[in-house]
């Protein structure tokens, strides 16, 4: 018996499917994650490019759209253990060019921008309330990194009882091994996995 057989025997990787009211969150596709000298690398640039198509679709069909940024005070007074573990995060202040959402995915009026100090889009923010106010029952999570802020957001999405979808070509990581391992684990326990084109086709079929 291989490891995948164990997951199958234990009943993981069931399909939850799309609900009637999806929303899209794009996690931390900011300038610093496009540059390997800061937080970039791996397949992040490809994921950004793929996400432009998903974002255009979401806008066309009228999904609520949210974007996240990690933003700390200029003096680091709101930083905690997360920033001690990765001190480079302290460069991500409100007006730093590094913390700005990439131009290809710039928010439009009416789209939420979540400023956060932790990995999850939900922790210490009003994101859950915003989703509830818009009647969302499904959350599509794109962004980076797959093993970090995407995963944390996915786990908290399920904790808020939302159907959760990860478009696999719209998430990225600075290294492929954690990207692949975390996609596997999220697919087993938390999210339905599909590509962006597969997701858009599934939505059109509803």
What residues fall within each predicted segment?
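Active-site acidic carboxylates
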Residues: 1-108, 112, 203-206
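Active-site-proximal loop->helix
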Residues: 174-187
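Internal catalytic-core helix/loop-beta-alpha segment
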Residues: 95-144
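A charged, well-structured terminal subsegment
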Residues: 190-206
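A short glycine-rich beta-strand->turn/loop micro-motif centered on a GG-aromatic cluster
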Residues: 140-143, 161-176
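Glycine-centered short loops/turns at secondary-structure junctions
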Residues: 60-63, 135, 161
